[in-house]
Amino acid sequence: MATNAGYLRCKEERKNESFFKVVQSINVSSENKRALPHDFSRSFTDKELSRKMKIRAQWGNSWEVGISKNPRFYFMEKSGWEKFVRDNALGNSELLTFTHKGKMHFTVNIFKLDGKEMMQPPQSRSFFASSSRIKTEQEENDIKEEVVVSSNRGQTTAAESKGRKLNLGKRAAKESQSSKRTEKVVRARSDYAGASSSTAAAFTILFKQGYLVFLRIPNSVSKDQVPDEKTVFKIHHPNGKKSWNVVYLERFGAFSGGWRRVVKEYPLAVGDTCKFTFIKPKELLLVVSKP
């Protein structure tokens, strides 16, 4: 039986110490906001914590950040931390997860406010302005091209029309089969459902390495489906034998306490497609498709 490399990597990551930070512009310089969690710090010796942290991003860039201690806690030194924040244009409530790889070396996963992970360094302001201008010009050209093509297309032949109808029919049949499979899973949990599968809200997330500790919910979902306060959700396995309580933190728009247990016991692995369907206001059915 073939081994899922992503699952093994994910399983190994769970053994490593990790913590998270949410970066806002108003607290970049705050010593409290640069603190290392107490439970995390006590996993290391004073000698280890006297070293500099080496933080490595997904795209290979790295930063060194010194660690200091006050009477209450260890914290990341301002100079190194501010450079890391500045280089990555952070400060808009990004969620960062830090995973210890040994000898105070850390990998960092950065998730933007919309829930998407940063997989490359941010570009300069001039680049964005240039890109925006190019994109606008390209869109205008595309519109002009579409108008010209449409005006020159003329009447569609009977063969082309018939071919399109056949393709549409095949696509509709395929989508219908997929819809029926989804409805079957939801009906299997109908004892929990407060609404039919056709009206149930759902969202899909591709599981990444950074989701081991926290899972950020898409903004569109959190605004429409999730209470604007700390809430406990129940996540159900489709086999009906497993369920987990997970804490949703409205400040971060993410599943927090209990989420690591879901990852471990479901289990989830890097590359999995995770579909969450609301079967009650505070209950979700999690269906996972393996790559």
Swiss-Prot record:
Positions of the UniProt region annotated as Disordered: 149-182
Annotated Gene Ontology cellular component terms: nucleus
Localization, UniProt: Nucleus
Biased composition (Basic and acidic residues): 172-182
Gene3D superfamilies: DNA-binding pseudobarrel domain
UniProt-recorded Gene Ontology molecular function terms: DNA binding
Superkingdom: Eukaryota
Annotated CDD domains: B3_DNA
Residue ranges with Polar residues bias: 149-159
DNA-binding region ranges: 19-114, 200-291
Pfam family for this entry, one: B3
Keyword tags: DNA-binding, Nucleus, Repeat, Transcription, Transcription regulation
Entry-linked InterPro entries: B3_DNA-bd, DNA-bd_pseudobarrel_sf, Plant_B3_domain
SMART domains named in the record: B3
Record's protein name: B3 domain-containing protein At2g16210
Organism (species): Arabidopsis thaliana
